[in-house]
A protein has these predicted regions:
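Rossmann-like NAD(P)(H) cofactor-binding subdomain of soluble oxidoreductases
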Residues: 1-58, 62
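Short alpha-helical interface patches
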Residues: 3, 9, 84-95, 113, ...
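Polar/charged alpha-helical tracts
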Residues: 10-11, 66-70, 74, 161-164, ...
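A short, flexible low-complexity segment enriched in Lys/Arg and Gly/Pro that occurs
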Residues: 18-24, 70-79, 163
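Glycine-rich beta-alpha junction loops
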Residues: 23-25, 45-49, 97, 132-135, ...
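Internal alpha-helical scaffold of NAD(P)-dependent oxidoreductase catalytic cores
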Residues: 29-39, 55-93, 103-142
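NAD(P)-dependent Rossmann-like dehydrogenase/reductase catalytic/cofactor-binding core
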Residues: 116, 123-175
Length: 175
């Protein structure tokens, strides 16, 4: 709320760094609401940070000096990667890097359950899925094959008849 922002600003020391996690309040608007305070950053943390594999884009305000930037980025290192991005793209990164896993986690868990139902131990199911997922991502993004060629590498695709409907759901959800 505006009053909470004003109250928070009153407590800020001049040498403080404020890192906003607010999704829609850009650095310029935040600086205005904070009475011109410019030692600002805005970031998009994501859930995979809990295993130090986060991809947490950050926008650094123009008023944030180099030493404060370095200290903030060092503080965030244990979370995973923290690429500096333009403030205008934070929401886009939120959709891809923060919400992206939610498109897949339930499917990964369903595959794990199937693997166990077919006889794999929980540990073997987990290890198999982990290796398969890493390999699948690397095949799609590092093989230099087109996405169509990658998807054609496996002759049997159990969800082939549902792919168009799934893509339609993704299109509807992103609007």
């Amino acid at each position: 709320t505006p009053s909470a922002i004003r109250d928070g600003f009153a407590a800020l020391r001049p040498d403080a760094v404020l890192c906003s996690l607010a999704p829609r309040l850009g650095l310029t608007a935040l600086q205005e609401k904070l009475g011109g305070f410019g030692r600002l950053a805005r970031m998009n943390p994501n859930a995979t940070s809990v295993v130090a594999q986060g991809y947490n884009p950050i926008a650094l305000g123009d008023g944030l000096p180099a030493d404060a930037r370095a200290a903030l980025l060092a503080l965030l290192t244990p979370l995973g990667q923290t690429p500096e991005v333009p403030d205008a793209l934070i929401e886009t990164y939120a959709v891809v890097s923060a919400m992206g896993p939610t498109y897949f986690w339930f499917q990964f868990d369903a595959l794990r359950q199937q693997a166990e139902a077919f006889g794999l131990s929980p540990a073997d199911a987990r290890d198999t899925l982990r290796a398969m997922l890493h390999g699948a991502v690397d095949t799609l993004f590092a093989s230099e094959l087109s996405p169509a060629r990658v998807m054609d590498l496996v002759p049997v695709r159990p969800l082939a008849d549902s792919e168009a409907a799934i893509l339609h759901l993704l299109d509807d959800d992103s609007e």
